[in-house]
């Protein structure tokens, strides 16, 4: 098994793992899990419309995107670290086995 095959296998495993985590962590309820409220015993009166609609202004909305800090308490951050480690290890093996040994062979044969 060559180093490029190992690197490709690690890459595919990383992608499949990410897709599995993304598919299982959507948190969206399916249509079978939703329940409709029961209307038994309620009169059919129309509900009053909204009295006033207030839209938030530009400065009323808070955003904390610039204060992101990684946390090791979530599964996704641990999974991202594992993926990064796999990429670093695969890159190391790729460089050592393909580039370095080709360089040594060229120097020895020249």
Swiss-Prot record:
It is found in: Virion membrane; Host membrane; Host Golgi apparatus, Host trans-Golgi network. The keyword Lyase does not apply. Its main location: virion. The chain crosses the membrane at residues 81-101. O-glycosylated. Contains alpha 2,6-sialic acid residues. N-glycosylated. Residues 18-80 are virion surface. Keywords: Disulfide bond, Host Golgi apparatus, Host membrane, Membrane, Signal, Transmembrane, Transmembrane helix, Viral envelope protein, Virion. Residues 102-110 are intravirion. The keyword Ribonucleoprotein does not apply. Residues 1-17 form the signal peptide. Residues 28-51 are annotated as: Disordered. Residues 28-41 have a biased composition (Polar residues). It is a single-pass type I membrane protein. Pfam families: Herpes_UL73. GO terms for cellular component: host cell Golgi apparatus; host cell membrane; membrane; viral envelope; virion membrane. Belongs to the herpesviridae glycoprotein N family. Envelope glycoprotein necessary for proper maturation of gM and modulation of its membrane fusion activity. Also plays a critical role in virion morphogenesis. Interacts (via N-terminus) with gM (via N-terminus). The gM-gN heterodimer forms the gCII complex. This is Envelope glycoprotein N.
């Amino acid at each position: 098994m060559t180093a490029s095959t190992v690197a490709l296998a690690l890459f595919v495993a990383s992608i499949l793992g990410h897709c599995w985590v993304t598919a299982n962590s959507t948190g969206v309820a399916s249509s079978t899990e939703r329940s409709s409220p029961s209307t038994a015993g309620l009169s059919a009166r129309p509900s009053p419309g909204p009295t006033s609609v207030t839209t938030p202004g530009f400065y009323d909305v808070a955003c904390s995107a610039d204060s992101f800090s990684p946390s090791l308490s979530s599964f996704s951050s641990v999974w991202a670290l594992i993926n990064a480690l796999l990429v670093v290890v695969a890159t190391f093996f790729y460089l050592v086995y393909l580039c370095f040994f080709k360089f040594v062979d060229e120097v020895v044969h020249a």
